[in-house]
């Protein structure tokens, strides 16, 4: 069985990270959460009170505090900037609401995309994000474009937040997700869009295992 590159793209809370982690584990591939990388930069920007126009200062911060990943004892992914564990802080609402603006900065994307491509060269990788199939891994053997209704995605994010103890209002989440969809698909640099050769998969009404099985079946055809 050959190792392949799997690119999973889609809007906020479409289930990308959840299914990507399971697929990577099942195939013994590396999982790279690119969204966590943009969240890490956003977290640093907020922590240092940097605006989106302060690009040089942001890039300098990235050099001083490189983003890296680790594993907890239970096998969960940990995210670090420098040697500081920021796994939980990057999921806070404040970071979520600012990440689209930071991710739209061309120089930040360029730096992170280059890092993502470097990691992917090892082969046997599952990567999820907004522009994996179109920009980061245009040569990936399998590209998936995951979508779901705004209502369903808000419901999922709501349950995740409650489980993490993050105070959340469902109606506010719906508005935030719709606004983020617009920002992500209308930005100038690497907008969210389906790659021409991507498999379109609407996950509305499907459970996680059903989505995983559909993607694994597509992957196995290419191995």
UniProtKB/Swiss-Prot annotation:
Q: What is its main location?
A: cytoplasm
| Recorded catalytic activity of this chain's protein | CMP + ATP = CDP + ADP; dCMP + ATP = dCDP + ADP
Keywords annotated in UniProt: ATP-binding, Cytoplasm, Kinase, Nucleotide-binding, Transferase
Pfam families (UniProt xref)? Cytidylate_kin (PF02224)
The signal peptide annotation in the UniProt record is none
Q: Does the keyword S-adenosyl-L-methionine apply?
A: no
Instruction: Fetch the SUPFAM superfamilies from UniProt.
Output: P-loop containing nucleoside triphosphate hydrolases (SSF52540)
Q: Where in the cell is it found?
A: Cytoplasm
Task: Identify the enzyme class.
Answer: transferase
Q: Which GO terms describe its biological process?
A: nucleobase-containing small molecule interconversion; pyrimidine nucleotide metabolic process
Q: InterPro entries from the entry?
A: Cytidylate_kin, Cytidylate_kinase_dom, P-loop_NTPase
Can you list the GO cellular component terms from the UniProt entry? cytosol
Q: Which GO terms describe its molecular function?
A: ATP binding; CMP kinase activity; dCMP kinase activity
Q: Where does ATP bind?
A: 10-18
Q: What EC number(s) does its UniProt record assign?
A: 2.7.4.25
What family does the Swiss-Prot or TrEMBL record give for this protein? Belongs to the cytidylate kinase family. Type 1 subfamily.
What name does this protein carry? Answer: Cytidylate kinase
